[in-house]
A protein has these predicted regions:
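Conserved catalytic core of the tyrosine transesterase superfamily
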Residues: 1-297
Length: 297
C-alpha cells in the first residue's frame, strides 16, 4: 500500500504533527478495510472513483457530518496524490472529487463578562489544580493560541526578560507572542507553585496534569467545558471558541487585522477573517457612528 512511505512523507517533508499523522493513518486504513470487505480490494492501483463514491455513501449512513466526511476523504485524497507524485499510480481516482457542502456556522465568541467571570472565579484558588486551570484559560484568552500549542509550551519557551512566549504552530512554525503584564505575573506564580508541588526539574513542559504528566488534548477540552459551562448558555464550548474570542475582542477594541493575523499565526488574512465576529451591539455602534445620515442628526 506504500502507506509507511506516505506517513514518512507527512512527517519529514510536510512537518505534520504526530497527532495529524495518526489521523491520516486511521482514515486510510479504515478506507482500505472498507474496500477489502466490500470489494476484496487491497491494492491502491485498483481503486476507482466509483469506490470513493461508495465509501462516501457508507460514511453518510453512519450519521457523520459533512465536515467529518470531507476530512476523511481529504486524507485519502492526499494519499493518492502522493502515490501519483512518486509514480506508483498514473492518476488519482479522486482527481475530480468535490467535497460535500458544509453548512456555515457562525461561531459566537464568549462575551467579555463571561470570560471575566471565569477568570475571577479561578483567581481565588491557591491549589495546584485551580492555579493550573487558571493559567490554561488565561493563556488561551491572552495569547489566542491553539490547543496543541498550549500543550507543548515548555518553561524554556518563556522569556520573562523580553516578555514573550515562543509557541510551535502548525508544521513546526515557531512564532513569538508578547505577554501582557497580568499573564506574566500569573505564569510566574504558577511556576513557583509547580516547583513546590513537583520539583523544579520534574518536566520541561509548563502545564501538567494532576498526576504531573504532560497535558493532552481531551484534558484541556474538559477544563474549558468545566468552567465555561458554569457561566455560558452556549451549546458549543471548546478551546477553539476561546481562540475565536481572543481575536474578536481584540478587533472590537480597535486592533489591526494584520496584527491579529500575526498573533494567531495565520499565513493569510482570509484565515483570520474566519475567526472574527462582531456582536450585534458592536456592529450597531459602528454603524451609528459611521453612517453619514446618522451623523447629521
Amino acid at each position: 500500500m506504500y502507506l509507511e512511505a506516505f506517513l514518512d512523507y507527512l512527517k519529514l517533508e510536510r512537518n505534520y504533527s504526530a497527532h495529524t499523522i495518526l489521523a491520516y493513518n486511521a482514515d486510510i486504513q479504515t478506507f482500505f478495510n472498507f474496500l477489502q470487505e466490500e470489494y476484496q480490494i487491497d491494492n491502491p492501483k485498483l481503486v476507482e472513483y466509483v469506490f470513493i463514491r461508495a465509501y462516501v455513501v457508507h460514511l453518510s449512513t453512519r450519521e457523520l457530518s459533512h465536515r467529518s466526511i470531507n476530512r476523511k476523504i481529504a486524507s485519502i485524497k492526499a494519499y493518492f496524490k502522493f502515490l501519483q507524485k512518486v509514480g506508483k499510480i498514473q492518476i488519482s481516482p479522486l482527481l475530480k472529487h468535490k467535497s460535500l457542502k458544509i453548512k456555515k456556522e457562525i461561531q459566537i465568541p464568549f462575551s467579555p463578562s463571561e470570560v471575566n467571570q471565569v477568570i475571577e472565579n479561578l483567581s481565588k484558588s491557591d491549589a495546584f489544580e485551580g492555579k493550573r486551570d487558571y493559567v490554561i484559560i488565561s493563556i488561551f484568552y491572552a495569547l489566542g493560541i491553539r490547543r496543541s500549542e498550549l500543550i507543548n509550551i515548555k518553561i524554556s519557551d518563556i522569556d520573562f526578560s523580553s516578555h514573550v512566549i515562543k509557541v510551535l504552530g502548525k508544521r513546526n512554525k515557531e512564532r513569538l507572542i508578547p505577554m501582557i503584564k497580568w499573564l506574566e505575573g500569573l505564569i510566574e506564580e504558577y511556576i513557583s507553585l509547580r516547583a513546590r508541588t513537583w520539583g523544579s526539574n520534574h518536566s520541561p513542559y509548563l502545564l501538567l496534569t494532576n498526576k504531573g504528566d504532560k497535558l493532552y488534548e481531551t484534558f484541556v477540552y474538559r477544563v474549558i467545558i468545566r468552567y465555561f459551562s458554569e457561566v455560558s448558555q452556549k451549546t458549543k464550548i471548546s478551546p477553539h471558541i476561546l481562540r475565536h474570542t481572543f481575536a474578536t475582542h481584540l478587533l472590537n477594541n480597535g486592533a489591526d487585522l494584520n496584527a491579529v493575523k500575526e498573533l494567531l499565526g495565520h499565513s493569510s488574512l482570509a484565515a483570520t477573517q474566519v475567526y472574527t465576529h462582531s456582536s450585534i451591539a458592536e456592529l450597531g455602534k459602528v454603524y451609528k457612528n459611521a453612517h453619514p445620515r446618522n451623523l447629521k442628526n
